[in-house]
Structures are given as structure tokens and as C-alpha cells.
Amino acid sequence: MSGTRIEVPVDDGVLSGLDFGGQGPEVLLVHGSGHNAAVWTDVVAHLVEHCRPVAVDLRGHGQSALTSSTAEQYWRDLGAVVEALGWDRPVLVGHSTGGYAVTAAVAAGLVDAAALCVVDGMVLDDRDAATDAQAQWQNPQAAEELRETFRYGWRATEQQMFSYIEQYVREAESDWLNAGSRPELVRAVMRRSFLRGGDTLYERRPSLEEIAVVSAPDPRAPIYPSMDVYTHIRCPITFVLPARGSYAQRRDEVQTLVDAVANRHLVEISANHNVPMTRPAELAAIVGDVVRRHS
């Protein structure tokens, strides 16, 4: 299931997205850094009979030509997306950075969500620790490591792009992030991550400049990627914690976060960080349960 390409208006332009059809409760799917709307394709295949899923490419990602000039734009866009879709109290699902995006949008009052499902995208540090952690992405060495590992910002000819995509697919099964993903899904996600520019070259999204901007939020902002963001949220939250994910070693902290409020729920899953691509059926079952319980 590939979905129908759509464009969704936001304050300064449009975001690209995929409308997967279906009927029932509305579900907005938000990817993490370096991914795009196509990452949800296999999850949606198990969901679409029970709900109305739409996925968007965050600004700076996928086929959304818009880029960020402030650290908050990418999550503030979600309010405009929900309004443009004409939705009332959708379920928001976010993976990795997308998990913070949906959390921040609800915390800021931009979306009145029926529930949140946050997939390996928690924020567990206080403001001081979170500020220190964000600072690492302003380091030129960190940027170079991202460029070397993921080719973020790389500009390629069409032939170079397709050659790289096929190499990426061949190596996926031995890759720490993609092992277990369906090859055609890996190909689709990677192809969508290249945006053609006016000079006919294709840019691997996101750029390093995009990452630098979104990684420098104002520590004095009311909504910040630290654990106090959850004090602004009243709707139910389901946290999905993969056994080999980014927060596996901080399980006790996640459990404390869940135990603090009665309408929070923790679901553990045997997976690496890339849950939408490597464990789509299991994730769809979790999201489906959230939809049934809270829509």
C-alpha cells in the first residue's frame, strides 16, 4: 500500500504527505529524523481497515520542499496539518523525533488529540541535561559523522541516486537500523528521501543545515524537549519501548514517567529503534489498540 500523494497547506507553504484512505478514526503518522512518510507504509497495511491514516513529510524531509528557519516549525506545522485535514481529535503517532513532534504539538495546544502513541521518541532529561545533549549537534564533527553515515545533504545526479539506493537496499539486512525491513520498503523510503532541485540534482534529505536548526531550540521556551513537556499534556499517552532501541537502557526512567499519571501506558516490543520498518505488524497492533481505546 503506497498511498496517494497529497499536499497539505501550512503557514508558509505546503508539506507533502501520503493519504492511505480508509474510514474511521483519524490517525496522523509522523516519522523521525532522516525518514519520511513512506516509512509507515507497512504499518498502514495492517491499520487501514480500521481507521483513516495520513502520513506527512516533516519540513526538510522527504518531498516537502519547505525547510526550517526556527527549531519549532517542524512540530508547529502539525497543528496546521490537522486543521487542513479537517480532523477533530485525531490520534497522533510519532516515531523517534516524530514522537517529540506530536508531543510538543499537543503540549502547545496546537492539536486536541484523542491520544498520543510515542514510539521510541521519549524525552527523559531535565532542561539542563537536555540543553547539553542538544549542543552536541552543533559540533562540526557530529555533523560530519551524520554526513558520512547517512549522506545527509548529499547532492547527486539521477544515476548516482539510483545507484546509491540499490546499494543501500543490498546492505540493509546487515545494517543496524534496517535489518529485518522489507527490501521494497527500504527502497521506497530511501527514494522518497531524495528531492529534486532546480538544477536537476537530487538532495538527500534532511540537510545538515536543517538538523542544526531543529537541534537548537531555545532552552527558555515554554515547550522544550525535556521531561517537563509532559506536564502540559492531559490526553492518554502510550509509550512504545523497543528492547534494542534508543531508550532501552533507560527503561526505569520511562516506567517512572508512565507511573506518574494514570492515563499513561507502556508497551514493550522486541525490536530495534526502527520499529515502523522492522516490526510493522506488531506496531500496527499497538496503534490499533490505542485507536480502539481512545477514539
Where does each model-flagged region fall?
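Conserved serine/cysteine hydrolase catalytic core
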Residues: 194-259
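Catalytic histidine-centered segment of alpha/beta-hydrolase-like enzymes
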Residues: 271-280
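Active-site loop/oxyanion-hole signature of alpha/beta-hydrolase fold enzymes
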Residues: 11, 54-93, 97, 107, ...
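Conserved alpha/beta-hydrolase catalytic His-Asp/Glu region
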Residues: 128, 151-213
